[in-house]
Amino acid sequence: MKMSNMLMLTLRESPAEAEIESHKLMLRSGMIRKMASGVYNYMPLGLKALKKVENIIREEMNAAGAQEFLASALLPSELWKESGRWEVFGPEMFKLKDRNEREFCLGPTHEEVFTDFARSEIKSYKQLPVNLYQIQTKYRDERRPRFGMIRSREFVMKDAYSFDKDNEGLDVSYNKMYEAYTKIFKRCNVSCSAVAADSGAMGGSGSAEFMVKSEIGEDEIAFCTECNYAANIEKAPAVPEKADKEELGELKKVETPHAKTIEELVEFFGVDSKKFVKTIIYRAENKVVAVMVRGDREVNETKVKNAVGSVDVELADEKTVKKATGAEVGFAGPIGLDVDYLLIDNEVTYMYNFIVGANETGYHYANANYDRDFKGTVGDFRNAVEGEKCPKCGKPLTIARGIEVGHIFKLGTKYSEAMKAYFVDENGESKPLIMGCYGIGVNRTMSAVVEQHHDDNGIVWPLSVAPYEVIVVPAVFKSEEQMKEAEKLYTELKKIGVDALLDDRNERAGVKFKDADLIGIPMRITVGKKISEGKVEFKCRNSEEVEVIDLDKVIARVEEEFEKNNLALK
């Protein structure tokens, strides 16, 4: 591509709306442009990079034995109601009606569609296993779109669905996808970790997320540097800290005027927050749930949802709290509580003589003890924290933030049973298909590349996903010799399969260099005054070194970079 014919949309300043580097640089380099909140148009340069990521995904999925498919993005509500998920996605699902008042949605994911296809077309074990994938636009009405393509309302996703006759087959399919994902992210030069995860609304038994560590990540990851254990904070088991044994004290009701929060109670009683147990009231659909955790801990709402079998939980309003406790917010406790579930974090059972709310405005109980004073469902209901014991090896955990770029699930029979997707096995028996689901956020992966590969001057694209691989820059537009040799070099590069740019614009060399750095082209060849000596300058974007080499050796130098990156020329 000659840049004189190219739509160059570079900006010298970052738009005020952009908060993170990938968003700033994708806007500044002219990769994307905002159309509405969470909705972006891809400019030619950005689309070219996106397609490079898609092609890597496609190659690895095909190599793993998956077959490409393309489903409709406009989905009838009947399928979602059949699976029981029409309401689960709630306000995130874009719902609409046609002129005949028939309900549809814009697909946020496609389990129902692929299950519907499978029940119509897969009848026998002889057709199994099968793995189908698509690369398609998805739609989710995010409450707070932010960070450019990291959390948008319209995004490109690769989603795959495997169908097997038994769980052993599912394990094989799942492991193939795990390996394919590892290869995909390695080829894209994205440094990420596979972590244990909760299946959430997707359902099923096993799940892993591919997470990129980032300070702006919306997920928290618990990981151990000793044994390589890693899990999303939603999934990570919290190992209880056992308090020193004490003689059980007499339960006492204490007046605590104007002391509602843990901070206020710590000041009032003059003891550490570890001596308090807070009781937090939630609504889980039509049920009221109370959760007890130590005063310095946080409730893990995902664990609570799983414990009560609810698709969603939310903090109860004042009216619900008043009905459950008989008191204002801030005085809830386990003794005399009127709720459907009382969930007690297992750490509480190792505590002695702690302080809880008395279910009476202005009062708390001192010297409360589990079993003697109250009982409930004991389990793990809190978030793991920095420094606590790894559940695998016992060494201290580290907590970091991360961006999810991929997620794989063992769905089992959740959808096939709900939608009656059955096949006939070797013995002539009808059985539900065993399913797996595997997603990659294509836009997110592209953004993650930019987050991990940039400097003060712009994007530093890895060669594998760069929109263009080499840029040829004649330093002086008015120099016939420089322009002629640059054109010849550009033509030679294209002949051997290099995705090349020729900056033939009537601009100063400094402007051309700045644009080349901003858009992140991996290799730059400058045809300058040394061309009269048969020499050009060669520079890699990820290095400060400028090499002066013979013109007749520059093609070989480009080929060398492809070999270093294990890439074949087309």
UniProtKB/Swiss-Prot annotation:
One of the GO biological process terms: prolyl-tRNA aminoacylation
Location, primary (coarse class): cytoplasm
Disulfides per UniProt: none
Subcellular location: Cytoplasm
Family membership noted in the UniProt record: Belongs to the class-II aminoacyl-tRNA synthetase family. ProS type 1 subfamily.
Alphabetical keyword list: Aminoacyl-tRNA synthetase, ATP-binding, Cytoplasm, Ligase, Nucleotide-binding, Protein biosynthesis
Job of this protein: Catalyzes the attachment of proline to tRNA(Pro) in a two-step reaction: proline is first activated by ATP to form Pro-AMP and then transferred to the acceptor end of tRNA(Pro). As ProRS can inadvertently accommodate and process non-cognate amino acids such as alanine and cysteine, to avoid such errors it has two additional distinct editing activities against alanine. One activity is designated as 'pretransfer' editing and involves the tRNA(Pro)-independent hydrolysis of activated Ala-AMP.
A single Gene Ontology CC term: cytosol
Pfam families assigned to the protein according to its UniProt record, in alphabetical order: HGTP_anticodon, tRNA-synt_2b, tRNA_edit
Assembly description: Homodimer.
Class of the enzyme per the UniProt entry, highest EC level: ligase
A GO term, aspect molecular function: transferase activity
UniProt name for this protein: Proline--tRNA ligase
Keyword Glycosyltransferase (UniProt): no
NCBIfam families found in the cross-reference section: PRK09194.1, proS_fam_II
HAMAP family: Pro_tRNA_synth_type1
Domain commentary: Consists of three domains: the N-terminal catalytic domain, the editing domain and the C-terminal anticodon-binding domain.
Catalytically driven reaction(s): tRNA(Pro) + L-proline + ATP = L-prolyl-tRNA(Pro) + AMP + diphosphate
EC number(s) recorded for this UniProt protein: 6.1.1.15
